[in-house]
Amino acid sequence: MTKRALISVSDKRGIVDLARELKHLGWDIISTGGTRLALEEAGVVTVAIDDVTGFPEMMDGRVKTLHPLIHGGLLARRDIEHHLQAAKQNRIELIDLVVVNLYPFKETICRSDITYDVAVDMVDIGGPSLLRSAAKNHASVTVVVDPTDYPLVLGELASTGSTSYQTRQSLAAKAFRHTAAYDAVIADYFTRQAGETKPEKLTLTYDLKQSMRYGENPQQAADFYQRALPITYSIASAKQLNGKELSFNNIRDADAAIRIIRDFKERPTVVALKHMNPCGIGQADDIETAWDFAYAADPVSIFGGIVVLNREVDLATAEKLHAIFLELIIAPSYSKEALAVLTHKKKHLRILELPFAAQEASEIEAEYTGVLGGLLVQNQDVVTESPADWIVVTKRQPNEQEMAALAFAWKTIKYVKSNAIIIANDHMTLGVGPGQTNRIASVRIAIAQATGQLEGAVLASDAFFPFADSIEEIAAAGIKAIIQPGGSIRDSESIAAADQHGITMIFTGVRHFRH
């Protein structure tokens, strides 16, 4: 009995060569619409789908493969006699191979000029149905959704006359992943269009971006996936100009770094980061000086760290970056001379280029945190804050220089692991106290790091001070300005301690925990 293949594809890469080989192996080919036209123009004889069903394609192609003579030929179990008898009685001929990929819904909705009606028309109905029917009956039917699998299938058909069960099972799993991902993108689009923010079902789809050597540690397997609908300002979308592949830890650190720099748009700024905590942030009127400040903030921790700059890297800055060991540099662009310097004798230095103009669009993306058996979803901590809404709760008011430093420190604090303390002036961080289980310990770490630079420095805390003991430590260090959310039942004690030591203190009313 002559074997039959059904071919209907949007992505026509390699389809003519596949069809020619199938014909050479003695297969009949059923095809539809544009696919059939492409094959016929290439000299491949096919059978029109409506010649099989007896019904013409109708409703602008919405109805063409949804027919018992097609799905019966796919779903009939070859090992069950009454299935075969039913097929024979109803003039259903078996179909042994399905080659289908779907209307380009994702690509369509990514275009800026697409209307809702056009998007709806790009929802494929018949294609997923064919794939699911064929994949369900993979014991007998081979289903192919990816042109890169054509050589595998043709090789087995040419060698043995059929595909192996292992191949059919693997391709069936791939087909189900394909249709699931396709439907997830559609569901996400319709959910957004309907304005729903808390759907009862959350379906996410990501595409494999990079197979990794290992995860956070060598004993952990890991891979890197990119959102099926990519966002531009993302490490997954960054252009790599030099260096080895990004590691698991590189990616996490780089993501933290580009989130921080996003809050510093107004002036040239450099962020140095290690283990997802900023170790130095500097801002100035030019990027070279901003780098000088970021480096001076902690020249020890920056060794082997990640640096992100929000302006083009020029030659002078590149020469300074080249002088120390860094894992990764990220910037919106690099001058030709700067790139030549950075890559000289540093083939392993990872250099990324990222479109900073797309920063704002990235702020609406949800954050997902996995827990055992569950997933936490939240908005990013990108609340708009204005110093006009802050309240000075002490007797002494901050002066202009202190106010600028407090605003700078407050931008920085939300990116430090809680309990978090930052000591800074108006252009650079001086001490970082991250991730301690009690706040006074973070205060002590930040003060110790900033020793010798505390003249005119200010301090920020990501959450309220539960006791006045931290204020006493801060006062003893000579710091005269504090910014914090407030909200403790003992706020009055902290305010009294600040007043006693002539410290000005601001309550912002906004907490910035980071775990």
Curated annotation (Swiss-Prot):
Residues 1-145 form the MGS-like domain. It comes from the Bacteria. GO terms for biological process: 'de novo' IMP biosynthetic process. One of its GO terms (molecular function) is phosphoribosylaminoimidazolecarboxamide formyltransferase activity. Keywords: Hydrolase, Multifunctional enzyme, Purine biosynthesis, Transferase. The keyword Plastid does not apply. Transmembrane segments: none annotated. One of its GO terms (cellular component) is cytosol. It catalyses: (6R)-10-formyltetrahydrofolate + 5-amino-1-(5-phospho-beta-D-ribosyl)imidazole-4-carboxamide = 5-formamido-1-(5-phospho-D-ribosyl)imidazole-4-carboxamide + (6S)-5,6,7,8-tetrahydrofolate; IMP + H2O = 5-formamido-1-(5-phospho-D-ribosyl)imidazole-4-carboxamide. InterPro entries: AICAR_Tfase_dup_dom_sf (IPR024051), Cytidine_deaminase-like (IPR016193), MGS-like_dom (IPR011607), MGS-like_dom_sf (IPR036914), PurH-like (IPR002695). Pathway: Purine metabolism; IMP biosynthesis via de novo pathway; 5-formamido-1-(5-phospho-D-ribosyl)imidazole-4-carboxamide from 5-amino-1-(5-phospho-D-ribosyl)imidazole-4-carboxamide (10-formyl THF route): step 1/1; Purine metabolism; IMP biosynthesis via de novo pathway; IMP from 5-formamido-1-(5-phospho-D-ribosyl)imidazole-4-carboxamide: step 1/1. Its EC number is 2.1.2.3, 3.5.4.10. HAMAP family: PurH. PANTHER family: BIFUNCTIONAL PURINE BIOSYNTHESIS PROTEIN ATIC, BIFUNCTIONAL PURINE BIOSYNTHESIS PROTEIN PURH. Belongs to the PurH family. The IMP cyclohydrolase activity resides in the N-terminal region. This is Bifunctional purine biosynthesis protein PurH. The gene is purH.
